[in-house]
Curated annotation (Swiss-Prot):
PROSITE patterns: HEXOKINASE_1, HEXOKINASE_2. This is Hexokinase. GO terms for molecular function: ATP binding; D-glucose binding; fructokinase activity; glucokinase activity; mannokinase activity. It comes from the Eukaryota. It comes from Schistosoma mansoni (Blood fluke). Belongs to the hexokinase family. Monomer. Substrate binds at residues 144, 161-162, 196-197, 222-223, 249, 283. One of its GO terms (cellular component) is cytosol. Residues 63-195 are annotated as: Hexokinase small subdomain.
Length: 451
């Protein structure tokens, strides 16, 4: 039986209907996340929660008065940065020198010693090239992986995410592993704070906006940090300060089954093929590391159903992670009547030999549905945080490639926050670029205030 283009498209709409959640669905997800966060903050129920709500031990966020020269390391994905940040006080933007290094695959999956040796070597290289090797520095280390913190310089890695699997690091204090390698090279550098990139994003935004109480990352991964009332944090003993920044690690939401009724067949098949099946399920529905792969799984299925590409799957699309999330950003820049980016992606990037107009339309729709759900899920998460802190006015500092570069992600996320937030709360999403660099340096600068 031969189907018309419109019939094929209608079949795709039906197949992808599970991605099209209602506001009631997102309300329920928001409620479930709130309950997971409540459980995560209590000692007696933390094990029952998929969201671990780690105290960051940052009890004073920067206020813009900090001054001095500090170093920051930013490790949170395949690209790793070394920064020199000069803070010049109120009203002045920090001066930043930085260099980006690509972490070799063998360092990501080899030994932890080799990974931290590489980090120390690149830091030494940076200092040498900038004439700073003989100077003394305090350093803020942005380490964007799930950690249990017992202090600003005691962060134990719970588990690797985002493609890392270096052994000998899980269960160990990453500040100590870093400091050991720095000391071996006789660098006059002291790691004074380990922070998550979301904590850094919050701190960076707080330098310029005192209403900032939330830091959000939507990039390779996703996570959020926020300022919590210390009296509600049982996980942290003997807190004297009234507030503490919580690193939620919300990417793990769903690991206790909270998202099962909304996970599609494609979410499940992608998860099974992933490096850590059953883990980081919310992150796998929201973040840039997974959305392209999710679309690839959809395309493979549609080819198997003889809906796409005349049933012929190109070799390139048989390869895991061959469909990059940045392609999704390009695709949604296309006007609805002229899908030239979509066509280019399929023909030039993915080597599909024959692409019909209906193929472009279907692939564009799949990309749109996947990213739309991701943005709405992120929005439901932010609404959950706003409900929790219940302030009249809140700035959310946001960073991450998906948020920054996708043409519709911010708009969609904002739309869902608006629908689910407390009625008496006004919020503002503010781009907080370089939070993991500038923010980590600012926290290093403010450490003396809280010690």
């Amino acid at each position: 039986m031969v189907f018309s283009d419109q019939q094929l498209f209608e079949k795709v709409v039906e197949i992808l209907k599970p991605f099209d959640l209602s506001v009631v669905d997102y309300e329920e997800i928001c409620d479930r996340m709130g309950e997971s966060m409540r459980l995560g903050l209590q000692k007696s129920t933390n094990e029952k929660s998929s969201i671990k709500m780690f105290p960051s031990y940052v009890t004073k966020t920067p206020n813009g008065t900090e001054t001095g020269n500090f170093l920051a390391l930013d490790l949170g994905g395949t690209n790793y940065r070394v920064l020199s940040v000069t803070l010049e006080g109120k009203g002045k933007s920090p001066r930043i020198q930085e260099r980006t290094y690509c972490i070799p695959a063998e360092k990501m999956s080899g030994s932890g010693t080799e990974l931290f040796k590489y980090i120390a070597e690149t830091l030494a290289d940076f200092l040498e090239n900038n004439g700073m090797k003989d100077k003394k520095f305090d350093l803020g280390f942005t380490f964007s992986f799930p950690c249990v913190q017992k202090g600003l310089t005691h962060a134990t890695l719970v588990r690797w995410t985002k493609g890392f699997s270096a052994d000998g690091v899980e269960g160990h204090n990453v500040a100590e592993l870093l400091q050991t390698e720095l000391d071996k090279r006789e660098l006059n550098v002291k790691c004074v704070a380990v922070v998550n990139d979301t904590v850094g994003t919050l701190a960076s935004c707080a330098l310029e906006d005192p209403k900032c109480a939330v830091g959000l990352i939507v990039g390779t991964g996703t996570n959020v940090a926020y300022i919590e009332d210390s009296s509600k944090v049982e996980l942290m003993d003997g807190v004297k300060e009234p507030e503490v920044v919580i690193n939620t690690e919300w990417g793990a939401f769903g690991e206790k089954g909270e998202l099962d009724c909304w996970r599609t067949q494609f979410d499940k098949s992608m998860d099974i093929d992933s490096l850590h099946p059953g883990k980081q399920l919310y992150e796998k529905m929201v973040s840039g590391m997974y959305l392209g792969e999710l679309v690839r799984h959809i395309i493979v299925y549609l080819v198997e159903q003889k809906i796409l590409f005349r049933g012929d799957l190109p070799e390139r699309l048989k390869v895991r992670n061959s469909l990059l999330t940045r392609y999704l950003t390009d695709v949604e820049r296309d006007p609805a009547h002229l899908l030239y980016n979509t066509h280019y992606m399929l023909t030039d990037d993915l080597h599909v030999p024959v692409v019909e107009p209906i193929d472009n339309r279907i692939v564009r729709y799949a990309c749109e549905m996947v990213v739309k759900r991701a943005a709405y899920l992120a929005g439901a998460g932010i609404a959950c945080i706003l409900r929790r802190i219940n302030r009249s006015e809140v700035t959310v500092g946001v960073d991450g490639s998906l948020y920054k570069f996708h043409p519709k992600f911010c708009e969609r996320m904002t739309d869902m926050v608006d629908k689910l937030k407390p009625k008496n709360t006004r919020f503002c999403l503010r781009l907080s670029e370089d939070g993991s660099g500038k923010g980590a340096a600012a926290i290093a600068a403010s450490c003396t205030r809280q010690n």
